[in-house]
């Protein structure tokens, strides 16, 4: 399996970290307000999970231990708990200054831990919420999940509109859900950004192409967010986070990551989980290649070594 280094690829976690990191740009009462608002926002979105059984002891971000985080993009709507359609597992090692990232296709066929059945990995969230999804990913990759960040994908719309739109670079022209997207650099509003991240059937790369567009939108959000200067926009952004994000990271964790893990965030190794599509009882699944999965697991474990 070949690792592809993609510069400037960020994750949903950095959307939150960027907001916090921008606090250092403020001065006086402005910075004071933002600091305390950020702290209260993070406290309000906290959700606990069990300590990983694959860890003898909990990691310490304060001591600059390598750690892992699972990014969960959940497509929740009114009256529908939704599924974890985006699953990105990351390891962050400040000693080697590297971050390893693997996107798990939502149709991946695997054992759902806690339910005892084989199914699509994204169904784990519908069956048992955050904890079941974390347990299932740990079993699938055979690595610990220390932290998670769960984001309602619907929030992309609110975030993008709060920022006044974002710019992405579309690799080809396509239409989806009533919206048309040209090839090249395009500007998206909130509804367009959401549609842009959801299309996959017209993409020759299928779910992998969709994942790339999600990362493009995230990068666009981060780039635009770095230029926020209005306290009103900060207030709106905090509201979006409060309504759409859950994590077991504390405010201190986030601040330590922002200050002590900068080098690791600049060197990201992207792993693509190779496999093939198959049908079982008439239902489509993505069957991960066992050899490729084993190679990824080995590299992830190595990246978590101190």
Curated annotation (Swiss-Prot):
Organism the protein comes from: Bacillus subtilis (strain 168)
Keywords: Cell membrane, Cell wall biogenesis/degradation, Membrane, Signal-anchor, Transferase, Transmembrane, Transmembrane helix
GO biological process, one term: cell wall assembly
Lineage: superkingdom: Bacteria
InterPro entries with a match to the protein in the record: LytR/CpsA/Psr_CW_biosynth (IPR050922), LytR_CpsA_psr (IPR004474), TagU (IPR023734)
Pathway(s) per entry: Cell wall biogenesis
Entry function: May catalyze the final step in cell wall teichoic acid biosynthesis, the transfer of the anionic cell wall polymers (APs) from their lipid-linked precursor to the cell wall peptidoglycan (PG).
Enzyme class: transferase
Identification of the protein by name: Polyisoprenyl-teichoic acid--peptidoglycan teichoic acid transferase TagU
């Amino acid at each position: 399996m070949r690792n592809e280094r993609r510069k400037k690829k960020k994750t949903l976690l950095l959307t939150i970290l960027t907001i916090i990191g921008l606090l250092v740009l403020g001065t006086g009462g402005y910075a004071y307000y933002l600091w305390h608002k950020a702290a209260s926002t993070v406290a309000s979105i906290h959700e606990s999970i069990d300590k990983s059984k694959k860890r003898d002891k909990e990691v310490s971000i304060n001591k600059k231990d390598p750690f892992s985080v699972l990014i969960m993009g959940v497509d929740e709507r009114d009256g529908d708990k939704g599924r974890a359609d985006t699953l990105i597992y990351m390891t962050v090692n400040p000693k080697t200054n590297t971050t390893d990232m693997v996107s798990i296709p939502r149709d991946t066929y695997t054992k759902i831990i806690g339910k005892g059945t084989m199914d699509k990995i994204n169904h784990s969230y519908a069956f048992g919420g955050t904890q079941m999804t974390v347990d299932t990913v740990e079993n699938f990759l055979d690595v610990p999940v220390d932290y998670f960040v769960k984001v309602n994908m619907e929030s992309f719309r609110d975030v993008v509109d709060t920022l006044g739109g974002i710019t992405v670079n579309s690799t080809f022209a396509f239409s989806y859900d009533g919206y048309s997207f040209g090839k090249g650099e395009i500007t998206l509003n909130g509804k367009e950004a959401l549609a842009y991240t959801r299309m996959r059937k017209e993409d020759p790369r299928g779910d992998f192409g969709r994942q790339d567009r999600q990362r493009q939108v995230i990068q666009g959000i981060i780039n635009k967010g770095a230029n926020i200067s209005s306290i009103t926009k900060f207030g709106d952004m905090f509201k979006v986070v409060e309504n759409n994000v859950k994590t077991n990271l504390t405010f201190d964790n986030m601040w330590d990551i922002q200050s002590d893990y900068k080098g690791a965030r600049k060197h990201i190794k992207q792993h693509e989980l190779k496999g093939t599509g198959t049908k079982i009882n008439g239902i489509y699944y993505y069957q991960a290649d066992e050899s490729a999965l084993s190679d990824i697991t080995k590299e992830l474990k190595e990246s978590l070594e101190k």
